[in-house]
């Protein structure tokens, strides 16, 4: 492993290196290379590797080797767990990109990956009420949909690391911000 190797970019998780990796020297369980970045987010698989590097996540090797997912297929907005429901309108390749080649994010409850413009959004990170002030009009409908009577209260009490966390997304097509509220 060449330490000067370019880190892979995760277009659906642009802040992955701050949020989902830690600087730990070790050997990747998947590729066997000495690495300095270890994934510390969710990975749903039978066998739990101790050390996954960003390269094995980005090229799909980690998901394939361990038959795992970083985000569950049905946790992507627009995908129904019910086989009787119509199939998702989002392209299968984009759904696989989220499940198999994009780092997940840690949450209290099962993580949810929001969509917009017929594609998965980019996860920007965790947001508190102050982070959301400039984009309140954009994200209020998402909160109101889940908490019709308490939307303003919820928005006022969101924090980056408390019991009510805002998970902020942005559409890669139109730039619209979306918000999922994760409850501890």
Each language-model region and where it sits:
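Preference for intrinsically disordered or flexible, low-complexity segments
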Residues: 4-184
